[in-house]
Amino acid sequence: RWNVLTSFVVGTSWASQPTSVDYGNTVIYTGDTVVVNGTQVATADEFALSAAQLAAVAPPASEAEADAAEWMPLGTFALSTDKSDTEPTKVIQLAISKDGIISGTYFNSATDAAMAIQGAVDKETQRVAFQFVEKPEIIMETGLYNLTQEDAPLIVHFSPTEREEYLLIRLK
């Protein structure tokens, strides 16, 4: 999956350098500080804000531009707090454009609610951040390489100071 993805997205040099995100190991929140791969990168508020900025994607300028976009599916994932969740009710389907835009749909079968998702990948760091179009204050983030695996860690920022860890589990 990784090799196909890296040849699809333009303007990247990822082919041999996948970056895996592992919250608690490669990305660590220590008090009000965020450390990535051993380097202090930001305060927790700044890190959440940078995810929000990455997720804030402008819609296509025209219908023609939207129709011309090329998309590659990243997969359909159960959203859970536990790998052993046998009956997840929340599902996320994601795709990526050649330009690194993330698009998709969230569906909660317990409430029959669906919401559009939009966001982007940082082509330098491979960080992926996306948000609900209808609730842009909720920001989700993971690593692009993680989205090519069977499960991917996910941080959900409910506000700059409130976040929770989730897991995206690939559905077959």
Spans of features found by a protein language model:
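Low-complexity segments
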Residues: 1-60
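N-terminal glycine/threonine-rich, aromatic-flanked beta-hairpin/loop signature
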Residues: 87-120
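Tryptophan-anchored aromatic micro-motifs
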Residues: 60-88, 151-158, 162-171
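Acidic/polar residues at beta-strand termini and the immediately following turn/coil
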Residues: 3, 96-97, 108, 122, ...
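Hydrophobic residues embedded in beta-strands of well-ordered beta-sheets
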Residues: 33-34, 40-41, 101-102, 126-128, ...
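Short beta-strand segments that buttress and anchor functional surface loops
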Residues: 78-82, 103-108, 129-133, 154-158
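Short, solvent-exposed coil/turn segments at beta-strand boundaries
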Residues: 94-102, 124-125, 145-151, 172
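Contiguous, well-ordered beta-strand patches that form the walls/edges
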Residues: 108-147
